Swiss-Prot record:
The gene is infA. NCBIfam families: infA. Residues 1-72 form the S1-like domain. This is Translation initiation factor IF-1. The keyword rRNA-binding applies. It holds the Pfam family eIF-1a. It is found in: Cytoplasm. One of the essential components for the initiation of protein synthesis. Stabilizes the binding of IF-2 and IF-3 on the 30S subunit to which N-formylmethionyl-tRNA(fMet) subsequently binds. Helps modulate mRNA selection, yielding the 30S pre-initiation complex (PIC). Upon addition of the 50S ribosomal subunit IF-1, IF-2 and IF-3 are released leaving the mature 70S translation initiation complex. Its main location: cytoplasm. The lineage of its organism: Bacteria, Bacillati, Bacillota, Bacilli, Bacillales. Component of the 30S ribosomal translation pre-initiation complex which assembles on the 30S ribosome in the order IF-2 and IF-3, IF-1 and N-formylmethionyl-tRNA(fMet); mRNA recruitment can occur at any time during PIC assembly. Belongs to the IF-1 family. GO terms for cellular component: cytosol. GO terms for molecular function: ribosome binding; rRNA binding; translation initiation factor activity. HAMAP family: IF_1.
Length: 72
């Protein structure tokens, strides 16, 4: 997938799910399933419910995404 095809949105983590998946509510009100990107996983950044995050989504599947940044 090319970098320009990615949709970036901000949201809030609602719940943690098994297999490092998270339920995220986007700013526009939609809820999606998101997994953690490799850079966040390598640096052992903890993501907890209530955290504000940036999510990358593919235009082909708008129900899933990848968490790329956790705001402090």
């Amino acid at each position: 997938m090319a970098k320009q095809d990615v949709i970036e949105l901000e949201g809030t983590v609602l719940d943690t799910l098994p297999n490092a998946m998270f339920k995220v509510e986007l700013e526009n009100g939609h809820e999606i399933l998101a997994h953690v990107s490799g850079k966040i996983r390598m640096n052992y950044i903890r993501i907890l419910p209530g955290d504000k995050v940036t999510v990358e989504m593919s235009p082909y599947d708008l129900t899933r995404g990848r968490i790329t940044y956790r705001y402090k």
